[in-house]
């Protein structure tokens, strides 16, 4: 309804965006519907679930660390303005929050940093693709956008919405809405925000900074939204988890078994008349089989484990995955049941990884510049 008030229908620029983001988010969390499978044991189908290395989440975290880390510096020619902006960023935990947001930008393709004033105190919101609706854009130059967020309160929950709409002659107008509901109701109640419901900024400086992944969204080349770094590597993620699950099954199914006649697995009577089992019935190493006229003797079975072959297969899948997401070949190393960053990797200025990092840095630099302009405009900081 709020979008209709502004003259827009929901997500008019990309109707499939929400569906894609939810799919990417499922893979980021780790286990999806694709991790469920069934095995028939001769009597019935048994439901099973693949184990997961959560490689999508780990790769997004490692990619984010290339950009928002302790080496990041913001330099402004006017040192007075620089100090004030740096103070605001530090008070809002910018480095940590931006790093967390960047992880989700890599996972979901899009993010936004939104500075605003709360009783004349500068605050910053960090929103991922699930909370962003782009309303008007020229490629990735966003003019109109809506942000929304749901937060829990002591009495229930609170829905906040703010839309940034550009008038080509007057500048930006920001429309704010707040809705609340308590734990006993299902519908939200609109709160009266007074003059804050419509803020005419009289400025053409947007009070938001957009973040994207550098790759074109090949699911919709006209979409203004970014693409998950692993959007084209989902089959590889599933392949990684299948091999990882096979490693666990190899150990589990390859355990030694001792097959004993069922009469040998029964009980003897001791001197006190108590029944005592010949073999511990809870010991899964023993398996009772029918006795064929006393001819069946104890038999033992054991299998050679294929740990080395499966480890090599997992490493090959990891190499394929890291090449697809921008970390380069052989970035991860699987050892002792864990995934480690390969410290032997050396990044050259002529490598694919380096070039992809520079493309992402260009997008981040532009967003930080826009953020600094927005903060300076909000705080009415004057200077070049």
Regions found by a protein language model. Give the residues of each.
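Short amphipathic alpha-helical segments
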Residues: 81, 89-97, 105, 232, ...
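Extended, helix-rich architectural segments
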Residues: 1-143
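Extended, regular secondary-structure scaffolds
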Residues: 112-227
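Charge-rich, acidic-biased intrinsically disordered regions
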Residues: 5-10, 19-22, 118-121, 262-282, ...
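Hydrophobic alpha-helical segments and helix-packing faces
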Residues: 23, 29, 36, 45, ...
């Amino acid at each position: 309804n709020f979008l209709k008030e502004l003259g827009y229908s929901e997500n008019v620029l990309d109707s499939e965006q929400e569906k894609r983001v939810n799919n990417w988010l499922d893979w980021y969390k780790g286990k999806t519907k694709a991790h469920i499978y069934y095995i028939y044991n001769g009597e019935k189908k048994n439901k099973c679930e693949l184990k997961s290395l959560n490689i999508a989440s780990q790769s997004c975290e490692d990619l984010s660390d290339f950009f928002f880390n302790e080496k990041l510096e913001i330099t402004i020619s006017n040192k007075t303005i620089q100090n004030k902006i740096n103070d605001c960023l530090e008070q809002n935990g910018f480095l940590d929050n931006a790093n967390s947001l960047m992880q989700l930008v890599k996972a979901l393709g899009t993010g936004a940093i939104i500075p605003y004033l709360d009783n004349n105190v500068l605050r910053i919101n960090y929103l991922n693709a699930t909370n962003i609706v782009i309303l008007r854009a020229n490629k990735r130059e966003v003019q109109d956008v809506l942000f929304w967020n749901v937060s829990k309160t002591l009495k229930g929950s609170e829905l906040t919405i703010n839309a940034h709409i550009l008038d080509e002659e007057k500048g930006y107008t920001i429309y704010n809405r707040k809705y609340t509901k308590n734990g006993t109701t299902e519908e939200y109640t609109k709160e009266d925000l007074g003059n804050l419901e419509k803020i005419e900024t009289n400025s053409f400086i947007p009070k938001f900074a957009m973040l994207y992944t550098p790759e074109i969204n090949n699911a919709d080349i006209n979409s203004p939204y970014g693409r998950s770094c692993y959007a084209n590597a989902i089959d590889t993620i599933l392949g990684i988890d299948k091999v990882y699950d096979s490693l666990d099954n190899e150990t589990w199914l390859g355990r030694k078994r001792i097959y004993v006649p069922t009469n040998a697995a029964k009980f003897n009577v001791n001197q006190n008349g108590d029944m005592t089992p010949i073999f511990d019935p809870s010991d899964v190493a023993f398996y009772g089989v029918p006795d064929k006229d006393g001819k069946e003797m104890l038999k033992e079975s054991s299998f050679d484990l294929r740990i080395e072959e499966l480890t090599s297969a997992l490493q090959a899948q990891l190499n394929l995955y890291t090449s697809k997401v921008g970390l380069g070949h052989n970035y991860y190393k699987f050892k002792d049941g864990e995934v480690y960053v390969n410290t032997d990797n050396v990044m050259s200025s002529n490598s694919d990884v380096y070039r992809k990092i520079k493309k992402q840095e260009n997008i981040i630099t532009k967003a930080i510049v826009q953020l600094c302009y927005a903060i300076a405009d909000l705080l009415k900081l004057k200077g070049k």
